[in-house]
């Protein structure tokens, strides 16, 4: 392609991309990405001192390694977190909370069978550890085992019907089984809830009760500081991304998943699985490129 023609092609593509953006994105709602706090850094330094210099019992060392792993995870330092979790488990192999984190990491890596086993271990050690049902349900969802995912997420929803995100994850799974019935079920859950939490605004968008622009206006009005804005954006951008993905608009979905990640709310489920969504979209693109070359 000649340089001038190539320039025209790129310019046209950029113009079309700009036209396809929704109006509200002209005034995009953005937060300052969350950064480690001084308190978190001080706690990490103190933990390091205790682990290095004090004689600890095995239980104390395992617990401290777990707590440091959780802190590393919240800062996005997942390799360090995994190392601490593995060390804690080597000392005390009966820690359900450690298996839960390892199951999440295995899900993010696409190693679904191993993730199922990790979450099974959580529930064997502690049948009341309900977040393992959420995380196993999500792993089953990404693994394409929708009826089993529905069972787990239904049980997790029943534990707190007023939590909008439990309804949303259950809806995402039910949509894969029967889209029309999924909308009806989401509407019923919406009507039964007290709708006191921010996330019900996202449910209203999914049900067609409000527009995307109204959703973003509510988000901006509801945020009290940068932290709450970043958290709400992580949640909202992820579920908007899932919405556009269901419509086949992978480009918009990809942008929204990247915006989810950009807020640095590392310990939110939406941040974790936005990374997986991007990996899956990237794999689709790689597969398409390979097929074009054959």
UniProtKB/Swiss-Prot annotation:
UniProt keyword list: Cell cycle, Cell division, Cell membrane, Lipoprotein, Membrane, Palmitate, Repeat, Signal, TPR repeat
Membrane topology (UniProt): Lipid-anchor
InterPro entries in the record: Lipoprotein_NlpI, TPR-like_helical_dom_sf, TPR_rpt, Ycf3
Compartments, as annotated in UniProt: Cell membrane
GO biological process: cell division; receptor-mediated virion attachment to host cell
Superkingdom of source: Bacteria
Chief location bin: membrane
TPR repeat placement: 62-95, 96-129, 234-267
Stretch forming the signal peptide: 1-18
GO terms for cellular component: cell outer membrane; plasma membrane
PROSITE patterns with a match to the protein in the record: PROKAR_LIPOPROTEIN, TPR, TPR_REGION
Residues where lipid is bound covalently (N-palmitoyl cysteine): 19
Lipid addition sites, S-diacylglycerol cysteine: 19
Subunit structure: Homodimer.
Function: May be involved in cell division. May play a role in bacterial septation or regulation of cell wall degradation during cell division.
Full protein name: Lipoprotein NlpI
Protein's organism: Yersinia pestis bv. Antiqua (strain Antiqua)
Gene name of this polypeptide: nlpI
């Amino acid at each position: 392609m000649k340089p001038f023609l190539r320039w025209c092609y790129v310019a046209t593509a950029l113009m079309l991309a700009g036209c396809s953006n929704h109006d509200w994105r002209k005034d995009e709602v953005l937060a300052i990405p969350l950064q480690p706090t001084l308190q978190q850094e001080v706690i990490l330094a103190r933990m390091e001192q205790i682990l290095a210099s004090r004689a600890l019992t095995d239980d104390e060392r395992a617990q401290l390694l777990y707590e440091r792993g959780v802190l590393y995870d919240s800062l996005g330092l997942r390799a360090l977190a995994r190392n601490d979790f593995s060390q804690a488990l080597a000392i005390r192999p009966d820690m359900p909370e450690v298996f839960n984190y390892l199951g999440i990491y295995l899900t993010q890596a696409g190693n679904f069978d191993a993730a199922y086993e990790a979450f099974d271990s959580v529930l064997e050690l502690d049948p009341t550890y309900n977040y393992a049902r959420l995380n196993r349900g999500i792993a089953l969802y990404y693994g394409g085992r929708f009826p089993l995912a529905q069972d787990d997420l239904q049980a997790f929803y029943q534990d707190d019907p007023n939590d909008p995100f439990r309804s949303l994850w259950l809806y995402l799974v039910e949509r894969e089984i029967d889209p029309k019935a999924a909308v009806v079920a989401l509407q019923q859950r919406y009507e039964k809830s007290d709708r006191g939490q921010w996330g019900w605004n996202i449910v209203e968008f999914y049900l067609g009760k409000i527009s995307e622009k109204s959703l973003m206006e509510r988000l901006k009005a509801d945020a009290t500081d940068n932290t709450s804005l970043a958290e709400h954006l992580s949640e909202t951008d992820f579920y908007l991304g899932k919405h556009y993905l269901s419509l086949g608009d992978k480009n918009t979905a990809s942008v929204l998943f990247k915006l989810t990640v950009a807020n640095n709310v590392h310990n939110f489920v939406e941040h974790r699985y936005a990374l997986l969504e991007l990996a899956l979209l990237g794999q689709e693109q790689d597969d398409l490129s390979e097929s074009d070359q054959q």
